[in-house]
């Protein structure tokens, strides 16, 4: 049986790279470690840039990601969206346009994208603005038929998430990244890869 080879290129900010995780895995490393199928060979490439908003991401993603794509394999794109536009005072209309441009380019290249939305912080007032950003990002993705994993809503009031941020200087630690990985794995990861859910079949 010929192996399927999927090349996953992931773009995003420092949370994608596992910043603050003592194990150095982050949520993406945990997700990849859990994705096992005897008929599948996965190749992953992490392209993280700290403190990056949607405009900078839109400017750099194609030049960096396209070097990892190959006509010989199935190419997939993970977009780990940050909350940075809130701090940069980017309007939601501009955030929407930046993400739409990324997804439209990916669609033109027949690349299926999975988006992971921004995670909540500890500041409730700031979280209100991140909630709106999350809503906008989700709308853009779903209108274009790409998978969107909402991490903000389930984690906003999650006691373990907030405790982990408090203990780790405002960034996730092992527990926080584990929660993010669980959400990704259980909210569309396997269907996006066209794989059976674990335990099926």
Language model: regions and residue ranges:
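A general structural detector for well-ordered alpha-helical segments in enzyme core domains, enriched
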Residues: 27, 31, 64, 95-102, ...
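Structural motif
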Residues: 7, 75-78, 112
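Serine-esterase "nucleophile elbow" of acetyl-processing enzymes
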Residues: 1-50, 62-72
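Oxyanion-hole/transition-state-stabilizing segment in secreted/luminal serine hydrolases
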Residues: 21-24, 54-96, 121
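Catalytic His-Asp segment of secreted/periplasmic serine-dependent ester chemistry enzymes
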Residues: 120-201
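Glycine-rich phosphate-binding loop signature in dinucleotide/nucleotide-binding domains
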Residues: 67-74, 109-110, 191-193
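Active-site segments of SGNH/GDSL-like serine hydrolases
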Residues: 80-84, 102-134
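Cell-envelope and extracellular/periplasmic
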Residues: 15, 47-52, 79-86, 142
């Amino acid at each position: 049986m010929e192996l399927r080879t999927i090349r996953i290129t992931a773009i995003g900010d420092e949370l994608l790279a596992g910043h603050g995780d003592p194990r150095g895995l982050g949520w993406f490393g945990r997700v990849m470690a859990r994705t096992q199928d005897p008929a599948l060979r996965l190749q992953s490439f992490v392209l993280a840039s700290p403190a990056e908003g949607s405009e900078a991401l839109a400017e750099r993603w194609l030049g960096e990601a396209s070097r990892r794509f190959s006509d010989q394999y199935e190419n997939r794109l993970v977009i780990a969206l940050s909350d940075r536009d809130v701090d940069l005072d980017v309007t939601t209309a501009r955030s929407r346009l930046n993400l739409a441009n990324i997804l439209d380019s990916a669609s033109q290249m027949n690349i299926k994208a999975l988006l992971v939305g921004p995670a909540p912080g500890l500041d409730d007032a700031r979280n209100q603005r991140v909630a709106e950003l999350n809503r906008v990002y989700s709308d853009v993705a779903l209108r274009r038929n790409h998978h969107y994993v909402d991490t903000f809503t389930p984690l906003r009031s999650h006691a373990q998430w907030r405790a982990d941020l408090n203990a780790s200087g405002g960034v996730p630690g092992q527990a926080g990244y584990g929660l993010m990985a669980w959400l990704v794995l259980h909210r569309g990861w396997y269907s996006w890869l066209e794989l059976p859910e674990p335990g099926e079949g």
